């Protein structure tokens, strides 16, 4: 781990313009926006801010090379992704430094994201050559049936701020593998990592125009003209449920293929037969990874009443070991929230819970200074009516609710409009399968607190989204199925 990289030299290497048709260029309006370090409030970079004209120019560039790119061989595309995987690892400390500077997570966590994010490049470099079709006769014997997958076409990829590298690789890699061109819109709060990743893709040999990047302060100025353009054939979005719903409405006019990875309200269920020490260790990963700013973060700890006190005290002991501060400082294990609005929201959720009878076991205070810090917090005696139990927290707060039996645990866990991640700790294998059948979530971790993996299909149900990213399913989101019915020469006329 190298935290001694010269930050000024690194920031000077990161492109701050728009990537259109393989060229970095200024926004047509000349407008810019600033990127701040959430640990200090200092401006660390100023980027060109794309408008509607720039967005359309990026789509023009993507469309201009779509047919040629689709005709490249799977091996060519796989080799580019593999080279990108290698380059990301060669630049691991640079990527980690950028993430910590613009997003705030501790440097060691940023290093972990580099490893995780790069795996999507390696995984889809392998999947690119495994995009199999199917051949069989129809039951009547009159036709020979061939099904094959074709690139869906130009894509708009919109990524969030909380995992600046992994969310870009998780969308770009399958699009490249499938033979699609794309326009990438990174989050305005954390665009630097994506900008550097785009340059890395070019360095890996990606042809001009295949990947275009339009960072900007106005998301709607970029998304609206593209969604209205019939040439765009695919939208992939990771972000909040309200924004996702708005984008879905915009995608309806042109009947776009959509992938939506939206909000979550993950339950973390601890049954009476669970290994409590193991559950606490899993809870630290499920809750405090990324300081809780993750859609998969454990949002509600649903604990059997007979072990609630033991679990709470042991979890509190671990929370109190966390060191809050600037993620670039040695020994820091808990960084800042992304912005002042996020800090205010977390504080308001805790205040609402306390007003409704919850008890602060540890934490519950804002940090001092310029950064957006909040102490890791545990709340006990939390009711289901509190905002902290109903809303996505996106912060270092662990509300603990209790239950009496398995049916109540499932009722509490499913009492949400969301259905992304869930976690269960039990030593009973029969219960594991019963609970899996009863939970309404797309992802389930059993005796495991961190379950995301490039080889796994990631996605939710209900208001948590549509489609899957990663796994063998991930490349399918960027393809359309074509059926060929070929007359069987041995059949009758």
Description of each model-found segment:
Residues 44-50, 65-71, 157, 268-271, ...:
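Short, well-ordered beta-strand elements within core beta-sheets of diverse protein domains
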Residues 42-45, 232, 269, 323, ...:
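Conserved C-terminal structural/oligomerization subdomain of aldehyde/semialdehyde dehydrogenase
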Residues 242-383, 446, 491-493:
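ALDH superfamily catalytic-core signature
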Residues 181-183, 360, 443:
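A short hydrophobic/small-residue beta-strand
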Residues 133-278, 403:
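Rossmann-like NAD(P) dinucleotide-binding subdomain of oxidoreductase/dehydrogenase enzymes
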Residues 42-132, 142:
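Glycine-rich loop-to-alpha-helix module at the N-terminal edge of alpha/beta enzyme cores
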Residues 41, 77, 99, 121, ...:
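Residue-level signal for inorganic ion chemistry
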Residues 1-39:
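Hydrophobic face of amphipathic alpha-helices that form TPR/SEL1-like repeat modules
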